[in-house]
Curated annotation (Swiss-Prot):
Assembly: F-type ATPases have 2 components, F(1) - the catalytic core - and F(0) - the membrane proton channel. F(1) has five subunits: alpha(3), beta(3), gamma(1), delta(1), epsilon(1). F(0) has three main subunits: a(1), b(2) and c(10-14). The alpha and beta chains form an alternating ring which encloses part of the gamma chain. F(1) is attached to F(0) by a central stalk formed by the gamma and epsilon chains, while a peripheral stalk is formed by the delta and b chains.
Name of this protein: ATP synthase subunit b
Subcellular location: Cell inner membrane
CDD domains: ATP-synt_Fo_b
Transmembrane stretches, start-end: 12-32
Gene field: atpF
Alphabetically ordered keywords of this record: ATP synthesis, Cell inner membrane, Cell membrane, CF(0), Hydrogen ion transport, Ion transport, Membrane, Transmembrane, Transmembrane helix, Transport
SUPFAM superfamilies found in the cross-reference section: F1F0 ATP synthase subunit B, membrane domain
MF-aspect GO terms: proton-transporting ATP synthase activity, rotational mechanism; proton-transporting ATPase activity, rotational mechanism
Function as written in the Swiss-Prot or TrEMBL entry: F(1)F(0) ATP synthase produces ATP from ADP in the presence of a proton or sodium gradient. F-type ATPases consist of two structural domains, F(1) containing the extramembraneous catalytic core and F(0) containing the membrane proton channel, linked together by a central stalk and a peripheral stalk. During catalysis, ATP synthesis in the catalytic domain of F(1) is coupled via a rotary mechanism of the central stalk subunits to proton translocation. Component of the F(0) channel, it forms part of the peripheral stalk, linking F(1) to F(0).
UniProt similarity note: Belongs to the ATPase B chain family.
The species this protein was found in: Pseudomonas savastanoi pv. phaseolicola (strain 1448A / Race 6)
Topological type in the membrane: Single-pass membrane protein
Chief place of localization: membrane
């Protein structure tokens, strides 16, 4: 194998080509590789942050759901209590109204009973006077004996 000038010329050209590539071609390629590496790292970081954010959002959504369920249960409990209270108030109002109607009816019955008793006393007094007239066969003075009849009616 002979080393001749062509081989040396080719070696020099090759070294010049390598130096040229290292000086002008290699830096943009390295910069592109670093930029691509940075984009990939940023993408992985963003994915990691997104996964953490997703976990936090799911946890927060679960917490809000639990709070909403608890609040709904509390509202339902309050509604049940209010419903029971309304029913109790209605029962109490109905009982008071029934007592009032009962008392009013009792008073009306008492009043009518007293009226009937007074009417019966008056009729009894009149019957007693008529009976005494028939027994005695003579007319009895109504004015003179009205006081006697009233006393008799009051005793009855």
């Amino acid at each position: 194998m002979n080393i001749n000038a062509t081989l040396i010329g080719q070696s020099v050209a090759f070294f010049i080509f390598v130096i040229f590539c290292m000086k002008f071609v290699w830096p943009p390629v390295i910069a592109a590789l670093h930029e691509r590496q940075k984009k990939i790292a940023d993408g992985l970081d963003a994915a990691s942050r997104a996964a953490r954010d997703l976990e936090l959002a799911q946890e927060k959504a679960g917490q809000q759901l639990r709070e909403a369920k608890a609040q709904a249960a509390e509202i339902i409990e309050q509604a049940k209590k209010r419903g029971t209270q309304i029913v109790d108030e209605a029962r109490e109002t109905a009982r008071v109204e029934a007592d009032r109607v009962k008392a009013q009816a009792q008073a009306e019955i008492e009043q009518e009973l007293n009226g009937v008793k007074d009417a019966l006393r008056a009729q009894l007094g009149s019957l007693a006077v008529n009976g005494a007239e028939k027994i005695l066969g003579a007319t009895i003075d109504q004015n003179a004996h009205a006081e006697l009849v009233n006393k008799l009616a009051a005793e009855i």
